[in-house]
């Protein structure tokens, strides 16, 4: 007996596709193109788990579907291969990161090919390939050579930057320093998350509870000279560009919130030189100077500048707060406060931004000993340092209005600071009396109180009037602010792209302050060979240990020292979609005509965890390349789809009391210490795991199979090695086949939904494929033979209708990426035709073309056995005939007094009176009525006829 054997079939067809380059991208793009892209994976040592293929299968279906419809398809794959895990492995084992990375890439490639994805493997790339990161370095050079013209709202060559006359008069070095201050890529002292153990700077997202996400090592905030990218110059365009993108609304909102545009005002608070109330005279002089000179770009050291979205609440500012890293800290802190402030700042340096801004944290802070003057009313207010204010947002200082800001209110309560309400809430507000008494916070808009001449005006009116008045005095100006910060772009690690930057040094080896790019013809700058990759434990990159042969460069008669930081992992993933289009071009980033033919990406699929940073950074780089004329479209990704997470299998747990008796989940609570106890007895209960055989479904939940009164807990968790619920696709493919895995992941539910893995579900899909096999292949034979039921005959009317309904449904569902419902329709088709004594070949062949994007290996095999030599992947997509969808007649039941007595055939368009007449004319109905009288006829078009007789 010859059965469906995927372990024999699948490797054979994978080899066929490789040998024949079945999925090679066409050199000449046709009338319609489809660029389908997966977010490429980091090649970890663990390989793929079953969550990875979900998105890959979806894009593979789209790609195969598009090819069948005659579209030119680009569907590539590659690897985001730089990264800290490989370097950590190298430090532990001494094995070069390149060796482990290539081993992991080979394993990923094996697994991806094992799953039958129709990638163009001739275009595969890795960000660690020297020929690839040569162009990553080249793009950095473009960023370095670009400044942002705010008038034109675009990036321009640095050579076109207007140089002020006073700078020109200072000389060439000053001119170069002025250019450096405007470049999109620049050096700056930045507060960074420094991890001594890892020996590198970490992004905020890589720090969890003050420790590194990788390894759990302590992280400290320190100032460090870093490469930065001026992404903030593009904030407005990054925000505006979201409007035209076919992206999930939630993802757009995440990006919008990350950019965080707000409007308000910048306000300067004059710093008192003495104790509170001592600076009336100097303050008056300061105000006179400001009235004549206006609001300066740089506030200097006489003021604390704040940004506020609520200038209307200035009269309610009762204290100020500066971030622990504020540049004026040393000016503000009085000698008697220094030790306390220093200790506080040191403690704050070990906290991440997330920790510091956690709303549930108790507020902490220290008084600096200094005061500032509120420009609205001339009051002296104290200046505190507190870690809930971040140096990177706004100006790093705030005016604290505890009556109308929740964080400020909590701080004021903690340190017994005054609360002055200046906005009257609506009369029907539940807490109005407490708010007006300074006992509660009100953050919304209202009517001004305790605000001098502005009393009685609305929030909007006070904002406009007070900002205008202070602007006239040179103490404020309207401002737009963004939460988005410039991108910290350098890392103190080995396994990353070297910067193509040279620092000039004098004869003593000291830096002169002059920098230049490595010439294009000397790219790529490759990594040096190092004896070890261990970090120093101090902020000095591993590349600084390189031999002088690599480190020191002579160029045009001058000596230079290479930049020893490396780029972050984000760098290579910012532009890989472009290189896929022209991966072997050694003369240019991309051929202009090919870029024009293929861009933008038509469909981009990946996890929502990349919603903010990767997508934002890619869009930023792309816009710079667009401004500089290297690409022709302003956005890289037209349509974005986020696949949902596949969780581990559902886990069942129950509780048992000390006697071992099961306790229902509804009868358990947590006590004050967090222990789970029986609600009635107070006895502590223990969690026990249950097998699937020990539970049964009841309503929306599960209960014990042995006692239906005991409700059990059922939930699925994210797959992780620590939980032991990771499912390896290798074992699934071995036991069920790749087609079963692909089909199951698409059948689990909507692509975007989060859903739990269930191995019995894979078995169910495998059973469906077995039925498809038996529908075409005669299994009882000793040799593989097409079933005698498959014949060269035309479909009957019903078969034709089922076929064309299936073609239409699968086509429309493929277009909508509703793959689960397409599969359900193909299951209906199979159920119908397996009941047919004859199965027309045209129906079987059309069905296989529909199923092929989902289960390509099996369909190739069946297609071959139906007598075809050419791959099913090259066959045109079937089209449905609207006429075939229409039934010429339908069969409906005829009831007499509610009981079915006969069935009649009639037109689906028959009207109620025609249905009644046809029913009465049927002999079986006449016989059932006998001598009784029909007193009422009820006809439901297309459904049934009911005759009421007496």
From Swiss-Prot:
Keyword match Ligase: yes
Location of the motif 'KMSKS' region = 718-722
Cellular component aspect of the GO annotation = cytosol
- The protein here is known as Leucine--tRNA ligase
* Catalysis performed (reactions): tRNA(Leu) + L-leucine + ATP = L-leucyl-tRNA(Leu) + AMP + diphosphate
| Top-rank lineage group of the source organism | Bacteria
> What is the phylogenetic placement of the source species in the record?
Bacteria, Pseudomonadati, Planctomycetota, Planctomycetia, Pirellulales
* Sites where the protein binds ATP: 721
Family the UniProt entry places it in: Belongs to the class-I aminoacyl-tRNA synthetase family.
| Signal sequence segment | none
Per the UniProt entry, the Enzyme Commission number(s) are 6.1.1.4
- A Pfam family cross-referenced in the UniProt record is tRNA-synt_1_2
Q: Where in the cell is it found?
A: Cytoplasm
| Coiled-coil ranges from the UniProt annotation | none
GO function terms (MF aspect): aminoacyl-tRNA deacylase activity; ATP binding; leucine-tRNA ligase activity
A single Gene Ontology biological process assigned to it is:
leucyl-tRNA aminoacylation
Give start-end ranges for motif 'HIGH' region: 41-52
PROSITE patterns in the record: AA_TRNA_LIGASE_I
Q: Cite the entry's keywords alphabetically.
A: Aminoacyl-tRNA synthetase, ATP-binding, Cytoplasm, Ligase, Nucleotide-binding, Protein biosynthesis
| Main localization, broad class | cytoplasm
